A protein has these predicted regions:
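Acidic, PIN/NYN-like endoribonuclease modules and their adjacent C-terminal/linker elements
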Residues: 2, 71, 100-142
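Structured helix-beta-strand junction loops
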Residues: 34-35, 71, 88, 121
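Acidic catalytic patch
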Residues: 16, 43-44, 64-89
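Short, well-structured N-terminal submotif of metal-dependent ribonuclease cores
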Residues: 1-40, 53-60, 120, 129, ...
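Glycine-rich anion/phosphate-binding loops
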Residues: 91-94
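Alpha-helix capping/helix-boundary segments
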Residues: 9, 44, 81, 97-98, ...
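Glycine/small-residue-rich phosphate/adenosyl-binding loop
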Residues: 41-49, 53-69
Length: 142
């Protein structure tokens, strides 16, 4: 399955955000175990770097992006994606970019905690908890 993790899910995992990171990490483990085509929008890499550097430090930020690149295939944000995103997800152009890239890349599921994003998209969207429950996986208790 082609699965795209939204930026907030990556941040849950990397920053161990309370109340969210266990389900997000379990979803990641499940994608790895199932040999899914796990994807990340290229802009998420820079967003994660920026936030992790700010909250932790540059070394942790670089390690985080490197690990993301080991686990997920980056999806390019090119002119076609940028133009396609203009009418989508208003007023949030950033979500429009993710939506446009997901459509072009034929992503089957977007895993996100953003309840308002991607509602009108023809691609399934699920929270990390919904994703693992649907796949019959238990939340990893850490």
């Amino acid at each position: 399955m082609k699965v795209l993790f939204d930026t907030n899910v990556w941040l849950d995992i990397i920053l161990s955000r309370g109340g969210f990171w266990e389900a997000s990490l379990t979803a990641l483990y499940d994608c790895i175990d199932e040999d899914d085509d796990l994807c990340v929008i290229a802009t998420s890499l820079k967003d994660v770097f920026f936030l992790v550097e700010r909250l932790k430090d540059a070394n942790v930020a670089y390690e985080s992006v490197e690990r993301m690149l080991e686990l997920a295939r980056p999806i390019a944000v090119d002119e076609a994606v940028c133009r396609r995103a203009l009418p989508l997800e208003r007023p949030d152009y950033e979500d429009g970019i993710i939506e446009a890239a997901a459509e072009i890349e034929q992503i089957e599921c977007i895993v996100t905690r953003d309840d308002d994003a991607f509602r009108d998209l023809g691609i399934r969207r699920m929270s990390p908890l919904e994703f693992i429950k649907e796949r019959g996986t238990e939340v990893v208790a850490l």
